[in-house]
């Protein structure tokens, strides 16, 4: 019976030009949710809207237009009411916020409304928690996702729990066609025997790929699924057919809960199955890779009877030679490039089949397996018995001239220069060439130290008249650091920095008590003792204390002067022998330096030289500005000040 239309809705439809059709009594209108479930086009539009990615569009505007089109194809506003569209959006958002594992299960049940989805989740929460396994089965190029609940130590309550896959075929297929299906590979009377094999397969914990919620277009492959299960029970299926494989993109889309579930339940169960199928895969390695959030992609090849597995073993103790350390520092080679001469070109996989890990602990032996075929591995052959010494552990760069071997290519290139005479490093100042850059750097320091320097205007820059020798102007090699302001050289950079403060006037050391600044830290330390009132140096004889050690030592010498240098004529004491000898010459009037012209005597030789200029008339100090000469240096300096005052 058709539902009566309200007058208000009827007027609205007539204004919008919508054609009204009267339904007959024998026609029943299906609900919109059921229509959506049965219509594969609507489901496809829904999936296209959910899986749309921004990268599929060329521009942001095109992405927005594409989303509007997909949303319109899914929601169909011309056929649904606002309440129905709102219910679909709420249901989609509810499924999105569910946890990953629970979301996949609820979507597989295809709830028609939000209330039905809530009922499914509440019913699942009331059931006891049991681990589930997800298996991806490849059947003629198609992937079939199946979920199986693992019953730990519990037998099925009835044989009906293991349903015959033949009975789950499409309803349109008759029993006769199912019996004579060529995909089964067995007549109908052999079905009980197949059921026994399938029951044995269930007890051995081999996951049975069942999924009642697969799309309708895949239902035609149920017969292929039965053939697959039959072959699996007979041991004709390899691990690749029942492997749980994830690509890099699929693994990055999983949340931490799904990755933990995959590592705890799927790998622990599936690896056990693989071992039972004679696949020697160590289970902890793959599980540790999964828990470190790295997808494990197995590489399994079909077993070949005529080909022996190429399996190599490499043992490394962790110790490295000196040549090996230099090679690792100078050559940026990956492990794959290093081992390619021995192992050949590896196949391209997401996870390489060969790998070497150098342990930090030299006491532990680290062994890794090499090869591509792991389906028939029963024993490993030592690499040292089948291949020569590894290149990393020996010398493999040979000189073609003399035959000498080197561990690194850079060492060989440097050695070849001895044969060719090549000197690629050239000095830009003098043109001299060197074979090594270190030799050139050492040579350039000589140019920097011997560079000519023009001294300021003082008694040192009087080259024409001053008796300053070239040896005094050229610093020794032991003082390579020169001051750019005055040309003075220093042996250490710290001395140069301390000296430069005399030119800049910098005083980086401040007294926190009075704020006074100093150029050297030692002076600041001495100054701070004034504020603290500390005089740590106390004289043991007279009780006088001193704040500086040098003054304390000078005071100590005064007490010991009687025993050192005491003048017997006047009683004066002297701490130094030179001062005492000069004092004695005064008493004896001894002047060993005598002038041959006038007979005048002098106690010092420099005084005699200066006196002799009065006889010879020599004036060695000449003014470079006016040419006037003087007999003494300080006379010239006093004269030059007159020139500087005139220019200013």
Curated annotation (Swiss-Prot):
Location(s), subcellular: Nucleus
Tissue-by-tissue expression: Highly expressed in testis. Also expressed in breast carcinoma cell lines.
SCAN box domain ranges (all copies): 46-127
Keywords associated with the record: DNA-binding, Isopeptide bond, Metal-binding, Nucleus, Phosphoprotein, Repeat, Repressor, Transcription, Transcription regulation, Ubl conjugation, Zinc, Zinc-finger
Biased composition (Polar residues): 165-182
Boundaries of every KRAB domain copy: 237-308
Region (Disordered): 146-221
PROSITE patterns: KRAB (PS50805), SCAN_BOX (PS50804), ZINC_FINGER_C2H2_1 (PS00028), ZINC_FINGER_C2H2_2 (PS50157)
GO function terms (MF aspect): DNA-binding transcription factor activity, RNA polymerase II-specific; DNA-binding transcription repressor activity, RNA polymerase II-specific; RNA polymerase II cis-regulatory region sequence-specific DNA binding; zinc ion binding
Pfam families: KRAB, SCAN, zf-C2H2
Chief site of localization: nucleus
ZnF C2H2-type span: 397-419, 425-447, 481-503, 509-531, 537-559, 565-587, 593-615, 621-643
Name of this chain's protein: Zinc finger protein 202
Gene designation: ZNF202
